[in-house]
Each structure stands twice: as structure tokens, then as C-alpha cells.
Amino acid sequence: MTVIYQTTITRIGASATDALSDQMLITFREGAPADLEEYCFIHCHGELKGALHPGLQFSLGQHRYPVTAVGSVAEDNLRELGHVTLRFDGLNEAEFPGTVHVAGPVPDDIAPGSVLKFESVKE
């Protein structure tokens, strides 16, 4: 597999896990504005080495998910801000421009040190 993007969660905002009950996980790179950081999983920003698109594999820790849809600005947001909203609902069309949809259950064991990655499953 080819890694398109990889980063590590460094801290978790006080209200970040609240979105998990709505099947969402919101990320932002270190240095996010304080009012946003409270709601985000903060990570050390990695380099985006390819395009985000359906068919990639998203992984978080030991969990693996197929990417089913990518919003029109999700790739730019990830590249520039380290920001992406992940939805664990398997939709085939992005609900919002900044959303990446994946199929599978919401992870319940996210902690600082968890590795987040997008990978191409084709060589």
C-alpha cells in the first residue's frame, strides 16, 4: 500500500469525543484556534502526498475503513489546515464539501499516539 497521508494524534479537545456519538471525527493540526481545538482531535500535521478519493483506505490505530466519498474541499482543507471531518456512515456522496465518508463503526479507543492514515490499496 502507498501512504497518501499519515499523522499522529497528539491531544484530544475537551469536547472532541462528543461528535463521535454523531458518527463524526473532526481533526485539526497543532496550532488550531483555541475555540476550534476544543472540538477536535489535534495532530502533528503530515504531508499530503496524493489525492483523496473513494477507494482509499483510512486507518486510525488498528481500525481500517474504506473511503466511500470525499467532499470537494476536503483535500485542500487537509493539505492546508490539517482539518478533515470524517463521517462513519458509508455514504457514496459527500454530505458537505469538507467531509470524508468511510464505512464502518466509530472507533472507541482513540488516544494521543493513535496514528491516522490514508492509503492507496492499489500498487
Curated annotation (Swiss-Prot):
- KW Transport (keyword) present: yes
Keyword terms of this UniProt record = Cytoplasm, Kinase, Phosphoprotein, Phosphotransferase system, Sugar transport, Transferase, Transport
Q: Which Pfam families match?
A: PTSIIA_gutA
> Where is the protein localized?
Cytoplasm
What GO CC terms are in its UniProt record? cytoplasm
Phosphohistidine PTM positions:
H43
UniProt domain PTS EIIA type-5: residue ranges: 1-116
Record-level GO BP terms: phosphoenolpyruvate-dependent sugar phosphotransferase system
**Carries keyword Lyase?**
no
Grouped into one coarse class, the protein's main location is: cytoplasm
Q: What PANTHER family is this protein classified in?
A: PTS SYSTEM GLUCITOL/SORBITOL-SPECIFIC EIIA COMPONENT (PTHR40398), PTS SYSTEM GLUCITOL_SORBITOL-SPECIFIC EIIA COMPONENT (PTHR40398:SF1)
NCBIfam families tied to this protein: gutA, PRK10377.1
Instruction: Relay the domain remarks.
Output: The EIIA domain is phosphorylated by phospho-HPr on a histidyl residue. Then, it transfers the phosphoryl group to the EIIB domain.
Name this polypeptide is given: PTS system glucitol/sorbitol-specific EIIA component
The coding gene here is srlB
